Amino acid sequence: MPQYRSRTSTHGRNMAGARALWRATGIKEEDFGKPIIAVANSFTQFVPGHVHLREVGKLVAEEIEACGAIAKEFNTIAVDDGIAMGHGGMLYSLPSRDIIADSVEYMCNAHTADALICISNCDKITPGMLMAALRLNIPTVFVSGGPMEAGKVRLTDGTARKVDLIDSMIAAGNSAVSSEDLERYERSSCPTCGSCSGMFTANSMNCLTEALGLSLPGNGTVLATHTARKKLFLDGAKRIVELTRRFYEQDDVSALPRSIATFAAFENAMVLDIAMGGSTNTVLHLLAAAREAEVNFTMADIDRLSRGVPCLCKVAPSTEKYHVEDVHRAGGVFSILGELNRIGLINDHCLTVHAPNMAEALKKEDIVSPQVTEEALTRCYAAPGGIPTIEPYSQSARWESLDDDRVDGCIRGGEHAYSKDGGLAILFGNIAQDGCIVKTAGVDESVWCFTGPARIFHSQDEACDAILADQIKAGDVVLIRYEGPKGGPGMQEMLYPTSFLKSKGLGKACALITDGRFSGGTSGLSIGHCSPEAAQGGAIGLVEEGDLIEIDIPNRLLQVKLSDAQLAERRQAMLARGNEAFKPVGRQRVVSKALQAYAALTTSAAEGAVRNLEQIHIKRD
């Protein structure tokens, strides 16, 4: 029988000093011997997805203690990718994932916590906490802060529609949008607390924790403002106490994250991601999480899965019609999983934190299942309140009806899929030998095959300036390099270049290729994560202005129209530059010591941009 980890610091004569300190945190004599559960919060006033989490942390901690355990809360950092976007702040976003993972490990191991509940939400926080949970392998439940309500804007010409953050960015670059209308977009796009309302990175990852089995149903789709979210937090607190007792008091290893997040569970998460056209960033994060779990889940597996999964759900930014609140009305993640299971694409034997296995969970949680529970149906009626607020679970609006239309609704059945090809695809070729990724759900099928001249840029700032100055024309392939994990460093998101292409009416007329990455809010022919990156000697660094680039999504191909001999000749010329080989030309960028340390240890996007300590070389005399 495993022993509570916390006994290390709470029992024995030699731990009198530690117990004295525990008492100073509020622990009473009768509490010693209870499990200590770490509440990893990520409250910050910088991020709308996290601005409400101070109250949530208190709620969760109180419920844990009501269930007979000790709750000890701490906070991690949280970077808002939208605020950090378009300037040097974006260099810090992806590196923050490792800082978050490390901080959770440090706190849990330093204080011998027995279990962990993760109150995450936005882009790098859920992945960072997921990496930590799988690294620690102690009982863990994820309860995210929940998605933001979609905004509603009425423009000066009287037109009205739903909007999100990306609409403001596109409008800003469109000179045809008046200053008054731009202000209306700005004031309407982000009306409440929560993670931005489309199927962007934050919501994608919070949905994927459901498919992995590490969070409760509704985690990815119940709105932050709705009272149903409060129940989810309370249920999560109860569940972590149950899992903790199961492992330590019943020797039930099925309560551990690595027993739940197996290879088959990672397949389920990726299949969901492909079917719902999730953010391309999820590929980075799933690869990184799998590595922490010691699961051999690779780009080859993602490529294999992407070729056989249809697109069953389209949400902003891939369509203006639906946002995450609409996915919830249609049954949420478990209804997408249910449709995938009906066509044989889900490993339903996988464990979850809330049901014996995925098969049992699907029976109860899929709203079109004959055995769906009343609780699941009630949860899916949770609707947006339409009132701007940063208060959590502050409204209880209900949809008049659920969307169970699997022919023309938000979620489709296999026979009525949006497309037989899923929403994400891995491409390979002579400038992406280790692969790259495109969100096909957001690409108009008319440009799935595209050839055009390369326009070369060594920073996204340079590319944005060219786009806004009308130097990019229809048919061009904008190629931004030296923005990968090492080359940036930090692998910046390219949301502004893609948004500005749309602003200029070029969203379906140009392609953008990078060894950097894209925001979950990106759509259009945007291909990222080209590996190896330019800074590591990748052939993307050998492309020259005007070279023809061929993109063939159906055949999973990305290449520059040059022979192997021509590329070899260019490589020799590049290497002849010595210390300046495979470095950006003319770019002025201050790189802090923190980012230099990240660059020294990080790996390729094809490996999840995780750290590889083998890259440390110690000089010895």
Curated annotation (Swiss-Prot):
Q: Which InterPro entries match?
A: Dihydro-acid_dehy_C, DihydroxyA_deHydtase, DiOHA_6PGluconate_deHydtase_CS, ILV_EDD_C, ILV_EDD_N, IlvD/EDD_N
Co-factor binding comment: Binds 1 [2Fe-2S] cluster per subunit. This cluster acts as a Lewis acid cofactor.
According to UniProt, this protein's pathway is:
Amino-acid biosynthesis; L-isoleucine biosynthesis; L-isoleucine from 2-oxobutanoate: step 3/4; Amino-acid biosynthesis; L-valine biosynthesis; L-valine from pyruvate: step 3/4
| Record: residues binding Mg(2+) | D81, D123, K124, E493
- Give the reaction(s) catalysed: (2R)-2,3-dihydroxy-3-methylbutanoate = 3-methyl-2-oxobutanoate + H2O; (2R,3R)-2,3-dihydroxy-3-methylpentanoate = (S)-3-methyl-2-oxopentanoate + H2O
Q: Which ranges form a coiled coil? A: none
Give the keywords, sorted: 2Fe-2S, Amino-acid biosynthesis, Branched-chain amino acid biosynthesis, Iron, Iron-sulfur, Lyase, Magnesium, Metal-binding
* Gene3D superfamilies in UniProt: IlvD/EDD C-terminal domain-like
A GO MF term = magnesium ion binding
Q: Does the keyword Transcription apply?
A: no
Active site per database record: S519
Please provide the Gene Ontology terms (biological process) for this protein: isoleucine biosynthetic process; L-valine biosynthetic process
Which co-factor is required?
[2Fe-2S] cluster; Mg(2+)
What does it do? Functions in the biosynthesis of branched-chain amino acids. Catalyzes the dehydration of (2R,3R)-2,3-dihydroxy-3-methylpentanoate (2,3-dihydroxy-3-methylvalerate) into 2-oxo-3-methylpentanoate (2-oxo-3-methylvalerate) and of (2R)-2,3-dihydroxy-3-methylbutanoate (2,3-dihydroxyisovalerate) into 2-oxo-3-methylbutanoate (2-oxoisovalerate), the penultimate precursor to L-isoleucine and L-valine, respectively.
Record-stated family:
Belongs to the IlvD/Edd family.
Q: What is this protein called?
A: Dihydroxy-acid dehydratase
Source organism of this protein record: Magnetococcus marinus (strain ATCC BAA-1437 / JCM 17883 / MC-1)
